[in-house]
Structures are given as structure tokens and as C-alpha cells.
Amino acid sequence: MKFLDEAKVYIRSGDGGNGCVAFRREKFIEFGGPNGGNGGRGGDVVVEAADGLNTLIDYRYQQHFKAQKGVNGMGSDRHGANGKAIVLKVPVGTQIFDEDKETLIHDFTTVGERFVLAEGGNGGFGNAHFKSSTNRAPRHANPGLPGEERWIWLRLKLIADAGLVGLPNAGKSTFLSKVSAAKPKIADYPFTTLHPQLGVVNADGREFVLADIPGLIEGAHEGAGLGDRFLGHVERCRVLLHLIDATCEHAGKAYKTVRGELEAYAETLADKIEIVALNKIDAVEPDELKKQKDRLKRAAKKTPLLISGITGQGVPEALRALAAVIGEAPVSDKAKGAADNAANAEPWAPQDA
């Protein structure tokens, strides 16, 4: 299952059914009177946050959704049936935007949450409705009202308690694979991770969801590398774990590069609680490690944790620091399911809007 976090969709609710013009015709009844029924109501377009989903890939292959039209009224005072609503199922964390991609319509945060995106048109009145003391045989009926139609954008922001950020090849995927059951692709080249990965982490008996976000490079907010499109997935995180590669040229500059991209994306993201860790400490000599630690401490204005995703050194301390910020709230079943599903997702590939 491929990962897709944005899709453009056309929706249309059902038109209302037309009212009917009919008269009662029975033997020995000369003036039967009107008995045309009303038209049925058109179906609604409903969006529902479903459990077990972690991608919008279904909307890559189908972009048009139309609800049923209401059935027309009939004679003998028979009203038309209402049109069947159509339900679009999306992952928890999905946001609905108007066609301008800026106007937020709804944000789904809980499993089972439903939102009526377009209401069906009302059915028209049959001629029986217009019978009065002065008009005993009306010969007109109302047509059904048209349904609503619009283009919308679906945008997914994965729900996680903590997010991993850093430059490409900083060891984020290795860290996630060591602390959870997630199986991200790991290799010794930049941009190995092409889509967000989720893992459920247990630290001191407390569970939380950790998201691995594809690496950022300088100029990501302008589209360089993979761009900053995946940063939306950490907007909901309560804390960020910023990993810096100890084998890089200058740990302080690496830290400032990522911080600059976070600030360029959104001030709220840059203001999140951040835990800084110097990773891959097993791959450098003690003297070089001390230099890198000092550089990072000056840049971050805090003492970084020293960890190694390969050997596990310092990893428990990092997890305890994350858990302390997140608190003791247990992870939801939805988050666990999303993490398991995300671990089996195929690599992300660019998709057309």
C-alpha cells in the first residue's frame, strides 16, 4: 500500500426527486382529487474517520463521488424514496480544505467522527400538497432542488506523540527500528526514507507513538530535496527528537539548518518542545565526539544527549526524556493500528494532483 497524504476530490450530493402531478381515478368517483406524492430527498456526502487507515491512496484512483438522486413522487400519494448517502472513509488526522487549499472545512481527530460535507437537495412537493379550499385540483408540482457540488482537498497529518527530525542520513530510521516494531528502509545514503513511518514505543511502561519524518535539507521550504511537505505530520506532535549525525562536518551547523527549515515552515512547529541528541557516537573518536558535542551545545543552547542507534547507548535515556514530556496518557488503539499499517507501506512516490 503506497503512501499518499494529499488528494483532490470532486463531490456532489444527490438532487431531490420531483413532485408528481396525479389524480385519483376510481370507478364511481367522479372527482377523485389530486394524489401526487412528494419527491424523495437527495443523498448526502458524508466523510468519516475510519480506523485502520493511514493513507489517502484510495483517492488517487477515484476522485469523483456522487450521492444518489431522490426518487420522484408517484400517484396514489406515494412519496419517492430518499437517495442513498455516500460515505468517504479517511484516516484519523485528515483535514478537509476548500478548493483554494487554504480554507479549513473540518479536521478529523477521533475514530468514527463524521461530517456532512454536502447535503442532498430537498424533494419537490406533489400536487396533493397544493390542494386547498380554493384550489381543489392543482395541476402543478415542484421539481426537486439540486444537490451541492464542489472540489475539495483532503490532507493527511499523521497523529503521533513524538516526531523524529534531522538531516538526511542522521540515523532516524535506525533509531525508530531499534525502539519499535516498525521496519523502515535503512541504507547508507541520503533520502532512504521517502514517506513518514510510525512506531509504537514502550518506555518505562508507558507507550507512545513516534513518527520518523523524511530528512530535511537547506532550502527544503523552497522545494529542495523532498521539500517540507512532510513536516505537516509533526505539527500534531507534542515533542520533537532532533537527531544530529556525529560524523557530519559540523554538528552545530547541521542543527541550525534543520531549525531554520522548521521556522520557515511554521512558527508553531519551531516553538515545540525539542530534545536534542547527537547520534552515531560509536562511529567517531572521543576527541572528535567532544568537539561535536561542544559545537552542538553552543548552537542548541542546551546539553545534547549522546546516543547510538546501532549499539543502543543512550537510547533509553532519550526515550525516557520523550515519555516525560508526553506524560502517562496511554497510546490509543488507533495510533497502534496506524503504526502497524505504516510499517508495511510501500515507499512513497510522487503523485499527480
UniProtKB/Swiss-Prot annotation:
GO terms for molecular function: GTP binding; GTPase activity; magnesium ion binding. Residues 160-327 form the OBG-type G domain. Mg(2+) binds at S173, T193. Its EC number is 3.6.5.-. GTP binds at residues 166-173, 191-195, 212-215, 279-282, 308-310. It is an enzyme of class 3 (hydrolase). SUPFAM superfamilies: Obg GTP-binding protein N-terminal domain, P-loop containing nucleoside triphosphate hydrolases. An essential GTPase which binds GTP, GDP and possibly (p)ppGpp with moderate affinity, with high nucleotide exchange rates and a fairly low GTP hydrolysis rate. Plays a role in control of the cell cycle, stress response, ribosome biogenesis and in those bacteria that undergo differentiation, in morphogenesis control. This is GTPase Obg. The gene is obg.
